[in-house]
Every structure is written in structure tokens, then in C-alpha cells.
């Protein structure tokens, strides 16, 4: 019994010692851990403060660069608003569509109509594709456009009643091809597969277009409207209307988007002329005048003796560079006063200097068309420099030397704005005339 008490006392003493040791450890070592924890927290706070300070410095630096932290969200919101507005516009437009017209492009001038005036796109984008098509809506009229070598009479389906046929009537071989298309359209009329037909014609440069007269409705034919290039004496503003020559789409001249540099950069050349200088022509006289007083050193001049129907990639780039880097583009007459160069210069904001004289042939009836040649451009207020003789050029070049860059920038803006307005106005006039002729005047 005594032994048991001794063991119990020993156990209690041992437990007391263990408790004392634990208490001593907790008192002396437990308190030492707290400062470590506090130090860790302080370190984290210090690191956070440093990071905050660093972010503050970075933020200040970004703000000094006018950085907008909400720029991405704002741009996304703006894109969403634009997309929504376009959807609303397209929906309202579709609801108002009353007419459908298909354009058959069988001449390169059709690409100027579709891509430059209508600002339409084509699928596929490949210019060598056999079949290309696109769609556009102008006012209440839905247009579809087809072009390419695979567009052949009798080999494509016709699901519209109203057609605009774009043809080339410049020379005999082209006239034969155009006539085949007109005969095909006439047969469609007879079988009531078509109701109305208009023709956009790349006419002869001498305005010798008598071959098409028999097809006009006014002469017992079936063509309601004729839009024709050059200053034809037939133009009456009713069923025969003038159409612009446009740019050389057959040479792959592109749709040009105006840029900041196009408007504001100093251009190294006062003028340019890249083209064919025919013997005993005003172009040859122009070349001689440019050589006087070193004027050819101020201009980008490259003349060739023979006309080339196609451009190489290099020659096309050189030509476009000349337009882009010249304040003026010299536009001497060729077979006709109107030339592709005029419209191509407008595309690049280079002021056309146009030789304003009538050429040989049947174009321009001066007794009734006092503004001929180029009466369409003049009627639309083209901001060009018109001259009657290239002897006027040296004085023009001298004046150019005194014009400030700011004045030139303003002049470019005026030209580019006018050209865009010119194309837009044509698109709406074209549509208004079609709607009036095809639909309004033919309502029963």
C-alpha cells in the first residue's frame, strides 16, 4: 500500500514537471514566434506598399502618355453600337426593298460601276475567277451583279425581270460580241423572261455608235435606257445619258482609300506624266515644253512611243507612285479628250491638268453642248485645271512653286471630297433613273 502511494506521488511529480516544462517552453519560445509572424506580415505590407508605389509610378507614366484604361471597353462598346446600328439599318432597308435589278458585267467598265461607284464587293475576290458576283442595296432597289468569262448567254439562270447590261462597243470585234448579247436579251424579252433592259456602253472614242440605235426603244427596239461614255451628241438627259469613263479596271487599277499621308505629306514632284507620246500629237508638244527651263526635272516624266494595253506589276506601281507623289497630273488628249488618267489622278488627290479641246470624230455637238468636251465632269463642278494649250503649262508650274503645303492640303481635300461626291451622286442618279423608267412609268 505504501509502495502504491509512493508510485502515485512519483507520477504526480512527473506530471507536474512535464507541465512546468511545457509552460516554460510556451512562455519563453511561444512569444518569440509572434514577432516572426508580425515581421512576416510587415514584410508583406511593405511589399504591397512597394508594389502599390510601383504601380502608381507605372500608372503615372501611362497617364503621361494619355493612356485610357477604359479604351478597350469603349472601343468594344463603340463597335457593338456600330454593329447594332448597321443591323437596324439593314433591317429597315430590307423592309423597304421594292425593286430588284441584276447587272450583267460584260465589259471592264462594269467593274468601275460596281466597285468604285456602288462601292460593292465581289466574291471571289480573285480577278481571274470565271464567275464573280456581289449584292448591294441603293434606296428601294436591290442590285445583284455578275461578271466573268463564265457569264455566257444561255448558260446561267435568270431569276430577275429587270437587267442592266454592261457592254464594250469600242471596236468592231467588241461590237460583234455586244450584239450577240443584245440579241440574247431580245429573245428573253420575247419569251417574257425579261421586262426591262438598260445598257451601259463603253462607246467608241470617236462617238461612232450607230450600230446600237436599232436596239433602242425609241427606234422600235427594246432597250429602255442607254448610258454611254464620251460626249455623244445623242445625250438628251431622258433615255440617253452620259456615263463616266472611270479608271482603267482592265489594267487592275484598284479602289484607292484616302490616307493621312496622301492628304498631308509634302509631294516631291510638282507634276507627272507617264504615258504614250504619239508622233505629231499634243502629247509630243507637251514633252517639248516640259524640257524647257528644266521643268522635266520638277516632274515625274516617263514617255513611251507605243501604247501598251496591259501593265506589268512594276509599271502599275510606278504609275500609282507617280500619282501619289505629284501635286498635279498632266492629262493631254489622246484619241478622245476624256481619259482614264483623269479619274485615276482624282483617286490619289493629284489635281488633273486637263487639255480642254475637242478631238476628231462625232463627239460633242458644240451648238447644243456648249460645255463639251467633258460636259459631265464640268456639270458636276470638277475642281480641275483646264487649259486650251500646253503653252500655258510653264506659268502653272511657276505658280505651283509659290503655293504653301497647307494650301495644297486643302486643295487635295477638296478634290477627294468632290470625287467621292461625284461617285455617290452618280449612284443615286443611276438608281433614280432606273426606278423611274423600269417601275414608276410602267405601272398600269
Swiss-Prot record:
Membrane topology per record: Single-pass type II membrane protein
Name under which the protein is recorded: Ribitol-5-phosphate xylosyltransferase 1
Species of origin: Mus musculus
Entry superkingdom: Eukaryota
Biological processes, Gene Ontology terms: protein O-linked mannosylation
InterPro entries named in the record: RXYLT1-like
Keyword Cytoplasm: no
Annotated S-S bridges: none
Pathway(s) it belongs to: Protein modification; protein glycosylation
Catalytic activity from the UniProt record: 3-O-[Rib-ol-P-Rib-ol-P-3-beta-D-GalNAc-(1->3)-beta-D-GlcNAc-(1->4)-(O-6-P-alpha-D-Man)]-Thr-[protein] + UDP-alpha-D-xylose = 3-O-[beta-D-Xyl-(1->4)-Rib-ol-P-Rib-ol-P-3-beta-D-GalNAc-(1->3)-beta-D-GlcNAc-(1->4)-(O-6-P-alpha-D-Man)]-Thr-[protein] + UDP + H(+)
EC number, UniProt record: 2.4.2.61
Record's keyword annotation contains DNA repair: no
GO annotations of cellular component type: Golgi apparatus; Golgi membrane; nucleoplasm
Task performed by this protein: Acts as a UDP-D-xylose:ribitol-5-phosphate beta1,4-xylosyltransferase, which catalyzes the transfer of UDP-D-xylose to ribitol 5-phosphate (Rbo5P) to form the Xylbeta1-4Rbo5P linkage on O-mannosyl glycan. Participates in the biosynthesis of the phosphorylated O-mannosyl trisaccharide (N-acetylgalactosamine-beta-3-N-acetylglucosamine-beta-4-(phosphate-6-)mannose), a carbohydrate structure present in alpha-dystroglycan (DAG1), which is required for binding laminin G-like domain-containing extracellular proteins with high affinity.
Family matches, as CDD domains: RXYLT1-like (cd21099)
Basic and acidic residues: compositionally biased ranges: 51-60
Extracellular face of the membrane: 31-444
GO molecular function: ribitol beta-1,4-xylosyltransferase activity
Family: Belongs to the RXYLT1 family.
Membrane-spanning residues: 10-30
Keywords: Golgi apparatus, Membrane, Signal-anchor, Transferase, Transmembrane, Transmembrane helix
Subunit note: Forms a complex composed of FKTN/fukutin, FKRP and RXYLT1/TMEM5.
Localization per record: Golgi apparatus membrane
Cytoplasmic topology ranges: 1-9
Taxonomic lineage of the native organism: Eukaryota, Metazoa, Chordata, Craniata, Vertebrata
Record-linked Pfam families: RXYLT1_C, RXYLT1_N
